[in-house]
């Protein structure tokens, strides 16, 4: 916690005021959910140096520093788990790494961003982009500042992670085209966006 909250008590749970103090504790695993990039990267790297495995849902830090973090985890012989960083914990990462490991992948297609998914669904029913976004914000499906979602940044982070797993090669930050849904001006069908393709065999 960053400040005392007079309404709630942590009970017997130890509350730390500095996120890095957790590394001075006797812990078996670090669960990183602070978000952001730089502090998260430092915290995760420091955990690996102390031979502490890490679980994270932070797609942004994996997008920016994934190669470094995976290497640090491997060099220190600890696990680095990140299932919740893509598709809200739906077991897509485990599925690709293990259950489908023997398959040959040619491409990855899908709707990876929740707010965009909702907005496109509304547009498919005839609602305009602006009205769909407003409706999503009013009902808590989109942030007050939806830029991260509707400009494709969130989806780019996720597709980079999945690409690294499937093709064994990350998509370097800022080296591939990112286009969100904010330029869609008329109702559109899902089939135009995420039509899956089957290649024989």
Where are the model-predicted features located?
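Rossmann-fold NAD(P)-binding glycine/threonine-rich loop
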Residues: 59-80
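Core active-site phosphate/anionic-ligand binding loop and the adjoining beta-turn-alpha structural block
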Residues: 66-67, 79-190
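Structural detector of well-ordered beta-strand residues that form the stable sheet scaffold
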Residues: 16, 53-55, 81
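ADP-ribose/adenylate-binding Rossmann-like module
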Residues: 35, 50-64
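N-terminal glycine-/serine-/threonine-rich beta1-alpha1-beta2 phosphate-ribose binding loop
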Residues: 1-49
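Short glycine-rich anion-binding loops that position phosphate/pyrophosphate groups of nucleotides
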Residues: 35-37, 60, 85, 113
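Conserved small/polar residues in nucleotide/adenosyl-binding loops
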Residues: 191-197
